[in-house]
UniProtKB/Swiss-Prot annotation:
PANTHER family: CELL WALL-ASSOCIATED PROTEASE (PTHR43399:SF4), SUBTILISIN-RELATED (PTHR43399)
Cell location: Cytoplasm
Lineage: Bacteria, Bacillati, Bacillota, Bacilli, Bacillales
Protein name: Major intracellular serine protease
Keyword flag Protease: yes
The family this protein is said to belong to: Belongs to the peptidase S8 family.
Family matches, as Gene3D superfamilies: Peptidase S8/S53 domain (3.40.50.200)
UniProt entry keywords in alphabetical sequence: Cytoplasm, Hydrolase, Protease, Serine protease, Zymogen
Peptidase S8 domain: residues covered: 23-307
Originating species: Bacillus subtilis (strain 168)
Amino acid sequence: MNGEIRLIPYVTNEQIMDVNELPEGIKVIKAPEMWAKGVKGKNIKVAVLDTGCDTSHPDLKNQIIGGKNFTDDDGGKEDAISDYNGHGTHVAGTIAANDSNGGIAGVAPEASLLIVKVLGGENGSGQYEWIINGINYAVEQKVDIISMSLGGPSDVPELKEAVKNAVKNGVLVVCAAGNEGDGDERTEELSYPAAYNEVIAVGSVSVARELSEFSNANKEIDLVAPGENILSTLPNKKYGKLTGTSMAAPHVSGALALIKSYEEESFQRKLSESEVFAQLIRRTLPLDIAKTLAGNGFLYLTAPDELAEKAEQSHLLTL
């Protein structure tokens, strides 16, 4: 297992000290409409496998239920999950920043976050073994969702096994598709673990649903979400706008927390990983973009409601 895995590279658009607004990405995927139904991801556990997290950030501290360090940062201390890069803190905020104290809100503001530090240093890189151990730890902790905005060029059998084992245990595994794209649907760019069929691979679009040129193309892309100029939390009580498929993936992880919570209440039972995935795909809008780039389309949490409304209107018109 030579080589390393890295955070999916991202662009820092700006850093901001003081914020009190709902990020555009949260609005355009229709998360607030789910909140209006009383669904905010309560009792859903999301493991964030990344560069760690600023656990004292006011928008995050009440959502974090624990964590573990698998890197050699801080002498490898298991409870040292500080974020020396900012990437992990930003991803965590998009998933579940609390909505009750100003600042920003994440997609699922009442979901619980397990911080699994698998990427170290200021540049956010890690060994395959760290990622594999992090996935296995998240499964042991009985999380509902694993969110990974990381990837590498190598298809490592042990990594695939860890992912398959997570899915077998009912965990939804979400991964950023990667930023090696060239905007051409015919050329494939593969980043692992996103390129594994078992993973929910997320590409990036703008909030106007235009494809991000950097978003990877391949046959395993499942859907796209906002990944450009995404406002979220950064270390030291700051906020910032970042760009990349790294920012798109946590929108889907947060959305899955809402969907799982809502649908299990509706069905009055636990849903399997494949059942929750089916409910996610119901909540997408097809785009006029090749499936190798956009998969099933754009994450849109109210899609079933709007379809039902249209059907009702056309039914009335035919009466």
